[in-house]
Amino acid sequence: MRVSSRKGESLAHLLKQEGIVNASVLNAVACTPRELFLPDALRHKAYQNTALPIGQGQTISQPYIVAKMTELLLASSNAPKAVLEIGTGSGYQTAILAQLFDKVFSVERIKSLQFQAKRRMNQLDLHNVSMKHGDGWQGWSSKGPFDAIIVTAAASQVPAKLVEQLNDGGRLIIPVGEQSQQLHCITRVGEGFNEQIIEAVRFVPLVAGDII
């Protein structure tokens, strides 16, 4: 069991005030050392509720949106166990998921970020995470279908490949849009889908095709 820090607990308390209610999510935030996922020059900002640059034109997401998206995944009626993450990035969201799901599968298009994230998972003794260097628009079909899918970059439209990889009752949480972005919650119901718009968000774009 992971141990919380005073700064982590303060951040979790702030997120609770911002509307995050799932106790498991708040505990995961409190127990995850966010400074581990940041460049040295930005570690003093680790417990601020803000997105920060991590290099390669990418960011570590605002803790509130990490918690909100995770909470939405866990609110699914099917008690999700296996989750696909599109956009490993720093690995911070990955580490939160690894404390709440039995299995985490994460796809990252930038090899150097994936390498660093994998090292951080080992540092934190989080061994239920599998990583792939690839195009997030394609998902990870050989490991699916998934109970939950979370996308940490904004797609111009919902990728069909990701929707296809959802289990019945599974949820896809994804930011959609270019200049104006909305967080979408899509639930698979048999062969159909229910879609709900949650709130306005701001993410880096989900790039298709190129992996580097």
Curated annotation (Swiss-Prot):
Annotated EC: 2.1.1.77
Database matches in CDD domains: AdoMet_MTases
Reaction(s) catalysed by this chain's protein: [protein]-L-isoaspartate + S-adenosyl-L-methionine = [protein]-L-isoaspartate alpha-methyl ester + S-adenosyl-L-homocysteine
Residue stretches in coiled coil: none
GO molecular function list: protein-L-isoaspartate (D-aspartate) O-methyltransferase activity
Active site as annotated: 61
Cellular localization per UniProt: Cytoplasm
Keywords: Cytoplasm, Methyltransferase, S-adenosyl-L-methionine, Transferase
Gene3D superfamilies: Vaccinia Virus protein VP39
Keyword Methyltransferase annotated: yes
Any single biological process term in GO: protein modification process
Assigned GO CC terms: cytoplasm
HAMAP family: PIMT
Role noted for this protein: Catalyzes the methyl esterification of L-isoaspartyl residues in peptides and proteins that result from spontaneous decomposition of normal L-aspartyl and L-asparaginyl residues. It plays a role in the repair and/or degradation of damaged proteins.
Family assignment from sequence similarity: Belongs to the methyltransferase superfamily. L-isoaspartyl/D-aspartyl protein methyltransferase family.
Designated name of the protein: Protein-L-isoaspartate O-methyltransferase
Protein source organism: Pseudoalteromonas atlantica (strain T6c / ATCC BAA-1087)
Lineage, highest ranks first: Bacteria, Pseudomonadati, Pseudomonadota, Gammaproteobacteria, Alteromonadales
Gene: pcm
